[in-house]
Amino acid sequence: MNREQIKEKYLSSAILYRLLEKKREKLITIISVLRFFTFFGGLILAWIGFTFSVTDGVILILLFTVLFLWLLKFYSKHFEKREFISNLASINQNEADALSGDLKAFDAGNSYSDIRHDFSFDVDLFGTSSLFQYLNRTVTDYGRDILASWLSDPFILSKDLLPRQKAIKELASKDKWRHKYMASGMKTPLEKNEISSLLNWMQERALFSSSALNKILILSLPALAIVSLVLAITGVLPYPVFVFIFLGNLLYIAGGLKKINNIHNALSRKYKFLSSIDRLLKAFENESFNSPLLNDVKLNISGDDISAAGSVRKLGRLLQAFDTRNNQIIGLVLNGMLLWDYQSIMRLEKWKSDYKRMFPVWLNMIGQVDAFISLGNYVYNNPDFVFPVESENYEVFSAKNLGHQLIDERKRVCNDFSLGKKGTVCIISGANMAGKSTFLRTVAVNYILAMTGAPVCASEMNFIPGKLFTSMRTMDSLSSNESYFYAELRRLFILKSRIESGEPVFFILDEILKGTNSADKSKGSLLFLEKIVEKGGTGLIATHDTSLGKMESDHPGTVINKCFEIEIDGENIRFDYKIQEGITQKMNAVFLMNQMGILD
């Protein structure tokens, strides 16, 4: 399928799911009406039954209670199903919109933006209409963080590249499963701040870890209360004995109430988030995979005969049971009879003892799967993109029909480009608006994706993994009293230091030393590039300064010239955005100023 056919598939799926959602909504309405009549009809019939006999009334109450509870469960089941179908409809509609260039449904990752980062700010990695927003389909904070880290620190070892590519390819082929996973996570988005108190509790010392007496009392006192109640009902013991034991249990609870409340405050109402974790783990556990990397993740989730989903589900049930204390009357009765708070905490601490080391691992695995799904979705939506290959002839970067993912394919101009071996510097000259900066970002974005294990916008690409470093959009800083020019010098110093340290740096620079006069800028740029070439630096630099082009003859085989040319025909100017060999011969600043009437 091509992108247009994929878009049509998304739209038809969205329509189908909306129809299914409406059908489910009608069924839910019918169930709601039945619940209403069951409740009030049961009350009326029970009242009539009691006029005949107590037994008839009790039987009718029990029958209608069972029917009402069954309808309630039936309602909850179909309500969740309707919500799931609604999520699937939204997913397909959002993907269709994304293929039309509308990315507003997806988080842009603004919180990850960092102007001091090696490259993310320069290449629009995060923010509105960024690469992150283009890729991001995560439904958990953990997945969002992992995807952001893969993109902002993408250097990958050779041995890890192919396994990751295989995992992404496999997930691309599982479009229905990907949507099921995403829809499962959309019900209650898994947020780190909601889970943090749960993780903190798991690291705390157990309340009863060193008290055998407490454990004995917690098991024996409820038994004593139950036995005394039975004996009181049968007339063997007077009721005051039971009341005395009941109140004694409440006093015992009161003695540890502060600790109990602290634990409950940390864990209360976390069930819905655990339910979300359970659904995501279950979706992954129940799917079969071929790629070794995904199977390694699966082993971390459900290895050693442990079901992560089942274990999390058990924790959720324990927390639900603990939350019954929120109803003061029920909590009072349960604590007086069964020491319910202590019983709940003991069961929770048993779970903590068994799984506290695994739970953070499960969360991390959920995040990895979430991030992989985003990249799998990217592959599915772009069938013409290719997976890059690690270079076997030592070329740092070479590509055919290289383009930028975020430019509409109808307007995208692609280029063939080869940098050469390590130690090569490419000087790209050209007029204003000729396409230099866009090309630099095109190289950077595809290099990032290549090292992430994802496909690139090209028909063919070879590369050597390295550490990307850019200086393209330097910002001044009022808060740190740092001027624009000083900020740029600081980045150039960092680049030089990285190269000298032996890091495999791949640099991309755009018009350096912009904050000084032309002669000073030209001299400074030349001296800086001479130093970079001397140190064996590898990368690209775009410039308007054609005098830098002479470095090619001074360093044959090490420095190469490329350019973007323009055509000026009378009052018209034409940009073809195609990279060429050599140094640009045409500039357009005065022409553009005249066109805009600035010089009139």
Where are these regions (language model features)?
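ATPase nucleotide-binding head domains, primarily ABC-like/P-loop NTPase cores
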Residues: 375-600
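Alpha-helical coupling/stalk and coiled-coil linker elements that connect catalytic or binding modules
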Residues: 1-431, 438-468, 490-491
